[in-house]
Amino acid sequence: MNENLLKKELFGKPISKQVTRLASEKALKVSKENPKAYVIGSDNMCTLDDKIFDKPIDHKDAVNHLQALSGNKHLQNNGISICFDGKEIWSNFDVTELVMKELSLQEIEDYLDLDKPYSACGCYHLESNGRNLFSSINGLESTVMGLAMEHLIEKLNELSIIEL
């Protein structure tokens, strides 16, 4: 699966469709290579209005991301897919709304130096010092971290893949 090519194909479609399709394609690829295993795929997209914030390409891009999110409400969108025997058996979409505090350039630079969140869409790690960047979080924190665990565990239990 070429993720960049797929993102271009999905451009303009609803975020829920984009993120669940990306999760599905990731899981399907591995599932076809491991047909007797349950495979979980996941994808996240950070959005502010109609703009998607991918992982930053460099430090300057990271600063620009955080400056755009500073003082604003944005969404972390998560898609999950479970595949078995090369077929998708379940998918889920979840969204968490976050409001970032107003940040100065120095606060942004200090945060980037501290957490180095360059591999995260939105350019922050909620599970670490990034938590301090927000005035409110409405939804599942696990969605922000890349995998809506509550929904996944519930489905794995329902499918008797795990037992709670």
Which functions belong to the PLM regions below?
Residues 1-38, 51, 103-106, 150-153, ...:
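N-terminal polybasic phosphate/anion-binding patch
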Residues 48-50, 84-87:
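Short acidic-glycine loop/turn motifs at beta-strand connectors
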Residues 11, 18, 44-74, 100:
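Active-site-adjacent loop/tail segments of enzyme domains
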Residues 23, 43, 62, 80, ...:
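Residue-level signal for inorganic ion chemistry
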Residues 37-38, 74, 79-81, 132:
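Structural motif
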Residues 63-67, 78-80, 87-91, 95:
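Anionic-ligand binding region
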Residues 72, 95-164:
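GST superfamily/GST-like fold recognition
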